[in-house]
C-alpha cells in the first residue's frame, strides 16, 4: 500500500526497559541495526499494525508491553535512489511512519526473534537511549532523532518513577498491642 506521494505507511517501535535503555535489533544476516518496524496492511490501524509487527519481529504480545507514547504526526524518510524499486508500480520512494514507545513489562527471556517464519532480526541488545540516533543507517537518522526527542519525556518519567520506588523505604509497621 503506497500513498499518493509514494510513501509506504509504516509503524516504528521503540521498546524500553525500566532503566530507560532501548532495544536495538540486528537485521537478519546483516551488520545493520535498527528499531523494529513494518508496514501497515489495508484496513489496519497503526496501533493494530504495531501489535502485529511486535509479535512478528520480536515475539511479544500486547500483555508483554505497555504503550507509553506515540508520535503526534507521521514522520517521513526518503529511500536513497539506489534502494528505490523503479520497476514496481506504484513506486515507493520512502516510508511514512507512526512511532510507538513501549515499556517492556515481561521478562527479557520472552523476547523471541524467531517467532515468525521469516525473521527480521537475529539478535538484540539494550543500548543507551540516544545511541540509535548515531548508529542507524544515515537516511533514517533524522526520523530517529525526531522520534527520540518526542519520546524523551515519557522515558524520563519512567526512570524517575523507578528511582522513586527504589529510594523510598517501606513504611514501618505499627506494633499491635
Swiss-Prot record:
Residues 6-149 form the Nudix hydrolase domain. Pfam families: NUDIX. A motif (Nudix box) lies at residues 38-59. Its cofactor is a divalent metal cation. GO terms for biological process: mRNA catabolic process. Accelerates the degradation of transcripts by removing pyrophosphate from the 5'-end of triphosphorylated RNA, leading to a more labile monophosphorylated state that can stimulate subsequent ribonuclease cleavage. Belongs to the Nudix hydrolase family. RppH subfamily. This is RNA pyrophosphohydrolase. It comes from Pectobacterium atrosepticum (strain SCRI 1043 / ATCC BAA-672) (Erwinia carotovora subsp. atroseptica). The lineage of its organism: Bacteria, Pseudomonadati, Pseudomonadota, Gammaproteobacteria, Enterobacterales. The gene is rppH.
